[in-house]
């Protein structure tokens, strides 16, 4: 199914009962919606939530912005535009207010959603993310190098690129190259936009600090981070929780910048508990 934000088409899928409260899941840089695995979505749905996952613009089956005009800072769009995409998906399914959870860049997007339209955000969960302030944007050199590599267009090279990245920033205890390769192959074979990650990264860098907006938020906020994250150090999550009034910070020991199945249960318990405590 598709939603529309102007000329931008956004592919989305839903799980669970549409009569239940809605949880919108927002992906990170270059990540397709299928990385919120159906089984993981099912765990949330079993807790009484309608779950919505979608491809951000410039990834998967949503619109490509290759060749789009750039602003003065070299960005084809901003995080604000991507936040509007999230609301467009909610509009398409007839939902006025939703709980939102975003990972990495997705965390930045849900922060922007809550800042711009707090009346539509019931609760926010920002995971492995940060505030847009330069001093809290800390990555290992190797992680940054791997993240900024041009997307491979050959299938085997793309799979190896995925594996190399997770070997650097994945959760060490649950490293599983066979699972990583299967996930990478699934994303590559699904097709759609290739090369949008660089444009998404430009949007992140162009959008600046959200500190003032986060300080003013009244949306109930949960912040989750792992202490083994080498793409966005936990100081980014701690800073987010520090800025948002009454935010709760949860550190998951041993977790990197990924979401292995062994941690899904913990994650669902945290998010569902946050939603229920604020409903």
Which residues does each PLM region occupy?
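Catalytic active-site module of serine/aspartate enzymes centered on a nucleophile-bearing elbow/loop
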Residues: 247-279
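Flexible "cap/lid" loop of the alpha/beta hydrolase fold
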Residues: 115, 123-153
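Short beta-strand/loop motif that positions the catalytic acidic residue
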Residues: 217, 223-225
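Acidic catalytic loop of the alpha/beta-hydrolase fold
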Residues: 228-232
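Gly/Ala-rich beta-loop-alpha elbow adjacent to hydrolase catalytic centers
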Residues: 102, 106, 110
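Active-site loop/oxyanion-hole signature of alpha/beta-hydrolase fold enzymes
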Residues: 59-101
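Alpha/beta-hydrolase
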Residues: 141-212, 219, 239
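Conserved HGGG/HGGXW glycine-rich cap/lid loop of the alpha/beta-hydrolase fold
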Residues: 8-68
């Amino acid at each position: 199914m598709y939603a529309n934000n102007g000329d931008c088409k956004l592919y989305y899928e839903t799980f669970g009962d549409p009569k239940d409260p809605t949880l919108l899941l927002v992906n990170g840089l270059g990540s397709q919606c299928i990385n919120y695995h159906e089984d993981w979505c099912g765990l949330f749905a079993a807790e009484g939530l309608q779950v919505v996952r979608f491809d951000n613009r410039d990834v998967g089956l949503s619109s490509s912005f290759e060749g789009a005009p750039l602003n003065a800072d070299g960005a084809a769009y901003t995080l604000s535009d991507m936040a509007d995409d999230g609301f467009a998906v909610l509009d398409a399914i007839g939902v006025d207010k939703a709980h939102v959870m975003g990972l990495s860049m997705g965390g930045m997007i849900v922060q922007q959603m809550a800042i711009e339209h707090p009346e539509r955000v019931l609760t926010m969960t920002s995971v492995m993310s940060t505030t847009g302030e330069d001093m809290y944007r800390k990555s290992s050199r190797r992680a940054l190098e791997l993240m900024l590599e041009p997307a491979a267009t050959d299938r085997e090279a793309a799979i190896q690129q995925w594996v190399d990245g997770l070997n650097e920033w994945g959760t060490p205890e649950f490293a599983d190259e066979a699972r990583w390769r299967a996930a990478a192959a699934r994303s590559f074979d699904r097709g759609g936009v290739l090369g949008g990650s660089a444009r998404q990264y430009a949007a992140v860098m162009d959008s600046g600090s959200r500190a003032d907006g986060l300080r003013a938020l009244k949306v109930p906020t949960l912040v989750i981070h792992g202490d083994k994250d080498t793409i966005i150090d936990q100081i980014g999550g701690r800073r987010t929780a520090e800025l948002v009034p009454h935010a709760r910070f949860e550190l998951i020991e041993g977790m990197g910048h990924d979401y292995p199945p062994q941690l899904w249960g913990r994650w669902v318990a945290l998010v569902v508990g946050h939603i229920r405590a604020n409903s």
